[in-house]
Amino acid sequence: MSEECTHDCSNCGAACSSRDAAPQHDAPNPNSSVKKVIGVVSGKGGVGKSMTSALLACAMARRGYHCGILDADITGPSIPKLFGIHGRAMADEKGCWPIQSRMGIDVMSINLLVENEEDPVVWRGPVIAGAVKQFWTDVVWKDVDFLFVDMPPGTGDVPLTVFQSLPVDGIVVVASPQELVSMIVAKAVNMAEMMKVPMLGIVENMSYVVCPDCGKHINVFGDSHVDEVAAKHHLSVLAKCPIDPQLASLSDAGLIETYPGQYLEGAADACEKLLKK
């Protein structure tokens, strides 16, 4: 394989060993049972990707599905904090066991394995990617309908590892309203196409804020460009989520499961359709 390989055989004439090879995903823990794997990605940080992962898992749990969240953001884990989970994950001869949230959502994160959750994880890329892979191969995801993989921003080692190692059934892209989103979303879409992973659609976060006095929607970051970006890439806009102080407060308190907003129902519908295919 060439060092310049993009993993997209359709535009390559080289007769390398990867051509026409079926994807070789890593086998999960033998005690695991996962029906669908959903990757939640973003082209840059700070757009609310982890919050979207958490709320989407909550939305599916309310529909009666058993959900799990694999926190693949090793150097910036936030999923346990959102759910108010501060314990240590336990392991036995079957593997490492995720910790369940109040709603029964299985959570695995590097913060559940370190001595102090405030200790930084200072690892190089290959070690980080290896840890994410072990969250799939060593953790027992028992009878999970939807496993949401909260990935770090960008298109680096971890997303590549996830797409190559896990049987990802669909990707949700989280973006913000700024015009810059066009280029950022394009990068995520192009990577998904290279790895032959289907896109479920785009979630626009921080889309607007609701005036507490008159109820008017105020576009804090200017006019949204998500519809034109979605149309350009033939994608659906799954949700437009507002800036909500209540959500911020509940997240800080580890009570995200009690948030009453239902802005991600469209994204939940897209995930649910995967089970019916």
Task: Give, region by region, the residue ranges found by the protein language model.
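Walker A/P-loop phosphate-binding motif and the immediately C-terminal alpha-helix
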Residues: 31, 36-74, 189
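Short glycine/serine/threonine-rich phosphate/pyrophosphate-binding segments
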Residues: 49-54, 77-80, 151-159, 181-184
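Glycine-rich phosphate-binding loops of nucleotide-dependent enzymes
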Residues: 108, 151, 164, 200, ...
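Residue-level signature of catalytic and energy-coupling elements of molecular machines
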Residues: 34, 45, 71, 79, ...
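Phosphate-binding/switch loop-helix module in NTP-utilizing enzymes
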Residues: 114-162
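C-terminal lobe/tail of nucleotide-utilizing enzymes
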Residues: 1-25, 189-277
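Conserved Switch II/interswitch segment of TRAFAC-class P-loop GTPases
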Residues: 142-149, 155-156, 167-188
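Phosphate-binding loop that captures ATP/GTP phosphates
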Residues: 66-67, 72-117, 122, 129
